[in-house]
């Protein structure tokens, strides 16, 4: 699975998730670690060692995101694109 659709709590959380995990201008994957998952909230660590939380629609979305992003954290894949549509983020890895 190289693409996933993640439903966030709202549009702001979707924009935050897309901005935190991928920088389109430099085609750079920023996420380095998943620090914690608390129900539908995910706490991410970035390359600059900062930590940020993102609230997803429900617990299933959190589980799906963690499963999908694990290979990126392990550096087996990189994020290649993100698209935001309202409260939805489509993430592509390669």
Question: What annotation goes with each model-predicted range?
Answer:
Residues 16-26:
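Short amphipathic alpha-helix segments
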Residues 24-81:
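Acidic, low-complexity, intrinsically disordered interaction modules
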